[in-house]
Each structure stands twice: as structure tokens, then as C-alpha cells.
């Protein structure tokens, strides 16, 4: 069993050297991701596609491989195929007949062939021969070239025949690390999660900068979002997570800055700080989730004033998107429930915020800040490899909160994503196991029986620790981590 990875069309349009570089990078990215699923994964690059071989002795890995490939940037689509050898067009038909006989019974169908190599026949010859045979010797209703019930997809590569058993749509975009790095300002809400995803999809290693206004609980929630985005869509490369203690800045704004200018000044201070951090990391652009007119600080005038605080490029991929479209996209990429449960920390709320800030007036207000405020904030910022989030959680969860045995009145909650749970169900004899995906746990935990203790389970223990810590920070004491 194999997967044939089709490159995103924009990659195919590149010049030969660029196309080769992109394809080689995509091959490396796929290998990095799939090796974490199974060390026996084999990946082979060709000119216009990449072949992924499922180990013959581990056919059960096909589903896991397919799910990972669907989330790797740079892929148009993936087809799962079975491989056969052939010597003639009749060989192709004879091997297709038992595979598709039952699938097309009582249905209309057509045959589509893609061919590579030198043969004494063309693709249309194969389509006619195989289609005619299937039409004559099966219980199919007949051939329909437009909108058939079943499409028989065959790929011929020299002396190999591939019968397509499944098609998986990819993310599109460019392979990770083919573009330069960006630093995304992430708050855990709908907008910043989607804007971060947009640049991951575009092939930019996306690092995260979080301005902490709400203490440990807020930071834990945002780390969950960042970790989910990285783990799902960008796992092939290491990225940084930077946490900036921003309460001192908010305190000075509330104490010293004119009420109407607070929102714009806050954003300018964030951009200044993020720019300093980006330069320290060798990053040339910031990414924000701002959308035109969504709030008072996001008018064109105010965005222009905000941009004047730094020479660093500020990118806003959501600038023309409607809020509902952003929410819909967050649902699709798996960050919606995180955003719904994220506490709102509006550290600076202006009663009459300006929508037409004047640069000179804003700069005059900013002179009221302590001279070394930004220096202090940048010095106190904590930068970690996003993979260290798991280790960080280990130091914050005590031994009594991590268990390997289950006692009476304890319920296990399997928080894995639905596709993971279906692939490898968790069944424990004599123990109640609830299935609540990690991205819904924060909103559903309050509805559970408070008299019981809940043990959170996931495959590697990372997300279960994050979720447990988040719930503990919210005041729940009946939650532990289950690590059998």
C-alpha cells in the first residue's frame, strides 16, 4: 500500500531550481512527521510527486499516515493506492475487475486514467478498454462520463499500475520553511489562531509571542492553542514560544495615558516589544489577527499610526475577512473551542476610544512612560522551544496528580481527537471511559458529576497535562492525569 502525494499547483509553476528545492523540502517535512508515527515510514521524492510507502507488516498505519499527510503544508491532495504489475491493457482490466465489481454494481461509473512512461497505448485507450469490460461483465447500470456515481481512478507509471482506493484533500500552500520565519502575536482568541495558521500554511515557520495580561491561567490556555497549531500543522520544524509579562505596561497606560488613546498606545507598545523580540530571534515580520473595522484600534487611520512605531513589517492576513468567516475557519482548523473557553482579558478599556488617532498626540502620550519600560519587559520575556511545553507541564503537575492505577469513583476521560480515538480506542475493563476531545473539555467539564474524580488520558501525555493544569487553575480539584 502506498500514498501518492500530489504537489500544490503553485509549486508546479515554479522554475526548475525552485521547484526542486520546494519538493525536496516537502519530502523532508513529510519524513520528519511520519517518522514520529513509525520509524519504518519510507518517503521517496520524484519530479512531480512524492511516494509514501506503508510498511507491509503494518497496514494499520495507513489511516494515521493519511491523517498526518492531510495536515502538511504544500500538498494539493493525496491518493491512497494499491500497486500492481502489468504487461498489457488486458492485464490492467483483469486486475481492476475484482476490485471494482462490487463498487459499481447498480451504479453508473466512468474510468479515468493518468499515465507516465512510454507505452504502445495512451490513457484514452485504457479508459475505453477497462470501461467497456467493466460495463459488459459487471452489474453496473452503465457508463456516465459526467457526474457518475463511481469514478474508477487508475494511475500507470511505466510498468506499475496503481488503483486509487482513497483520495485525501491536502492543505495546499507551500512546504514549511520554504518562506522566511514570522513571529505571530497570539492571544488564544479566534483571530490570532487563524492568522497563525494562515502563515503556517504559506510555508513560514511561525513562532509565537504572547502578551500575558491574565496570569497563569491565560498563559496555559494560549499555550494549548499554540501547541495544537504546531502539533497539527507545523510539527516538521521547531518553533519558539515567547511569553511576555505585560502587566507593568498596562499599569502605566491606565495610570498615565489619556483615556481615548489607550487602545492605540497599547497596540503600539505590543508592536515595539514584539519587534525587539523578533529582531533578537532573527525574524523580519510580525503577524497579527487584526481585521479592518472589527474594533476601534483597527480603523485604517489607527492601524497606520500603530505601524509607525516600528520599521519591522507587520502582516495582517485577516484584514478583509468577516468575523463569522474567521470563526468558521477556526472551527475547521480545530481552534474554535479553545477560543470559546479563553478568558477575556481586556487590560485596557477606553470609554471613548479614538478611531482617528493623531500620530503626534499619541507620541506625546508615550513620552509619559518610564524610559526603560520596554527594556525591562523584553529582558523578562521567557522564550522556550514549543516542544518544551510538555516538560514545563511536568514540573507544574505533582506526583499525586499523575496516576497509573484507577481507583473507585474515578472516571477516565479520553481527550484525544476523534480520529485518534477511533483508530486506537481506549477500553478499560470495569472502568467508565468518557470520550471528550481536548478542544471541548474546557466547555464541558463543568457539566460533569462533581462528586467524581476524572483522569485525563492522551497518547503522549502532553495535552492531558496541559488540560489538567488549565482546569486546576480554574479551581477544579477533581482532575488528574492518567499515564498507564
From Swiss-Prot:
Q: Where is the THUMP domain?
A: 63-167
Where do the Rhodanese domain residues begin and end?
Answer: 406-484
- GO BP, one example? thiazole biosynthetic process
What's the superkingdom here?
A: Bacteria
GO CC, any one term: cytosol
Task: Cite the active-site annotation.
Answer: 458
Its Enzyme Commission number? 2.8.1.4
* A GO MF term: ATP binding
InterPro entries, alphabetically? Rhodanese-like_dom (IPR001763), Rhodanese-like_dom_sf (IPR036873), Rossmann-like_a/b/a_fold (IPR014729), ThiI_AANH (IPR020536), ThiI_fer (IPR054173), ThiI_N (IPR049961), THII_Thiazole_biosynth_dom (IPR026340), THUMP_dom (IPR004114)
Q: Which compartments does it reside in?
A: Cytoplasm
What keywords were assigned to this record?
ATP-binding, Cytoplasm, Disulfide bond, Nucleotide-binding, Redox-active center, RNA-binding, Thiamine biosynthesis, Transferase, tRNA-binding
Q: What is this protein called?
A: tRNA sulfurtransferase
Organism listed in the record: Shewanella sp. (strain W3-18-1)
Amino acid at each position: 500500500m502506498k500514498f501518492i502525494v500530489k504537489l500544490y499547483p503553485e509549486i508546479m509553476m515554479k522554475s526548475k531550481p525552485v521547484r526542486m528545492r520546494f519538493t525536496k523540502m516537502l519530502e523532508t517535512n513529510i519524513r520528519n512527521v511520519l517518522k514520529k508515527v513509525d520509524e519504518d515510514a519510507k518517503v521517496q521524492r520524484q519530479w512531480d510527486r512524492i511516494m509514501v510507502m506503508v510498511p507491509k507488516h503494518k497496514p494499520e498505519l495507513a489511516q494515521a499516515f493519511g491523517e498526518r499527510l492531510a495536515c502538511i503544508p504544500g500538498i494539493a491532495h493525496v491518493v491512497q493506492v494499491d500497486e500492481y504489475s502489468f504487461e498489457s491493457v488486458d492485464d490492467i482490466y483483469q486486475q481492476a475487475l475484482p476490485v471494482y465489481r462490487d463498487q459499481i454494481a447498480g451504479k453508473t461509473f466512468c474510468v479515468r486514467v493518468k499515465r507516465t512512461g512510454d507505452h504502445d497505448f495512451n490513457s484514452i485507450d485504457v479508459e475505453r478498454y477497462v470501461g467497456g469490460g467493466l460495463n459488459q461483465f459487471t452489474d453496473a447500470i452503465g457508463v456516465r462520463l459526467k457526474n457518475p456515481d463511481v469514478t474508477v481512478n487508475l494511475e500507470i507509471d511505466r510498468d506499475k499500475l496503481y488503483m486509487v482506493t482513497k483520495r485525501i484533500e491536502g492543505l495546499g500552500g507551500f512546504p514549511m520553511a520554504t518562506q522566511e520565519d514570522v513571529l505571530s502575536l497570539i492571544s488564544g482568541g479566534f483571530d490570532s489562531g487563524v492568522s497563525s495558521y494562515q502563515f503556517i500554511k504559506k510555508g513560514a515557520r511561525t513562532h509565537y509571542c504572547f502578551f500575558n495580561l491574565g496570569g497563569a491561567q491565560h498563559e496555559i490556555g494560549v499555550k494549548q492553542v499554540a501547541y495544537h497549531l504546531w502539533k497539527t500543522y507545523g510539527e516538521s520544524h521547531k518553533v519558539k514560544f515567547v511569553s511576555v509579562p505585560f502587566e507593568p505596561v498596562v499599569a502605566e497606560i491606565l495610570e498615565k495615558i489619556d483615556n481615548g488613546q489607550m487602545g492605540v498606545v497599547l497596540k503600539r507598545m505590543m508592536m515595539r516589544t514584539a519587534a525587539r523580540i523578533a529582531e533578537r530571534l532573527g525574524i523580519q515580520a510580525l503577524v497579527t489577527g487584526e481585521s479592518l473595522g472589527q474594533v476601534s484600534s483597527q480603523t485604517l487611520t489607527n492601524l497606520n499610526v500603530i505601524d509607525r512605531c516600528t520599521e519591522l513589517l507587520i502582516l495582517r492576513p485577516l484584514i478583509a475577512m468577516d468575523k463569522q468567516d474567521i470563526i468558521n475557519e477556526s472551527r475547521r482548523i480545530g481552534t474554535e473551542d479553545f477560543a470559546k473557553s479563553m478568558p477575556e482579558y481586556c487590560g485596557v478599556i477606553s470609554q471613548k476610544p479614538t478611531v482617528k488617532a493623531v500620530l503626534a498626540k499619541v507620541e506625546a502620550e508615550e513620552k509619559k512612560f518610564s524610559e526603560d519600560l520596554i527594556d525591562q519587559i523584553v529582558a523578562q520575556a521567557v522564550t522556550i522551544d514549543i516542544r518544551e511545553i510538555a516538560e514545563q507541564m511536568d514540573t507544574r503537575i505533582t506526583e499525586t496528580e499523575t496516576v497509573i492505577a484507577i481507583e473507585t469513583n474515578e472516571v477516565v476521560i479520553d481527550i484525544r481527537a476523534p480520529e485518534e480515538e477511533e483508530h486506537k480506542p481506549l477500553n478499560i475493563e470495569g472502568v467508565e471511559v468518557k470520550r471528550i476531545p481536548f478542544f471541548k473539555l474546557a466547555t464541558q467539564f463543568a457539566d460533569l458529576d462533581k462528586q467524581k474524580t476524572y483522569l485525563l488520558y492522551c497518547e503522549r501525555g502532553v495535552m492531558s497535562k496541559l488540560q489538567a493544569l488549565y482546569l486546576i487553575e480554574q479551581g477544579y480539584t477533581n482532575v488528574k492525569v492518567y499515564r498507564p
